[in-house]
């Protein structure tokens, strides 16, 4: 599988700089793209991003997408499987990992105290 990302050596990530709400997410969940681009229309590319949940924010429905996703929980708490009111689900602590093939439903998600996730998204362009 070809990976097309620019070369970036170690650099300080501006954690206080610009964060953007991803399409389909509620306010309070924001991303910072570290490297790469993911073209969901042409189904090509890859990206690595940080995803930040503010305290108390939650999503109300599962997510499903057509690309691979790998997630590593860097800090904070993440609850997976809450209902549309943000209740219930299973709580995870830092140093938790997930790998999801395309088409895998996942979520909804919630964070009580906030969290930061490191995510890689990519299309398998050999198919």
Regions found by a protein language model. Give the residues of each.
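A short, N-terminal "cap"/entry segment at the start of jelly-roll beta-barrel domains
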Residues: 1-45
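Ligand-binding loop in jelly-roll beta-barrel domains
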Residues: 91, 102-126
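Short acidic-glycine-tyrosine-enriched beta hairpin
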Residues: 82-103
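Generic detector of solvent-exposed, compositionally biased contiguous segments
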Residues: 30-60, 98-101
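Short histidine-centered beta-strand/loop micro-motifs
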Residues: 42-43, 59-65, 82, 89-90, ...
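Glycine- and acidic-residue-biased ligand/ion/polar-headgroup-sensing regions
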Residues: 55-59, 64-84
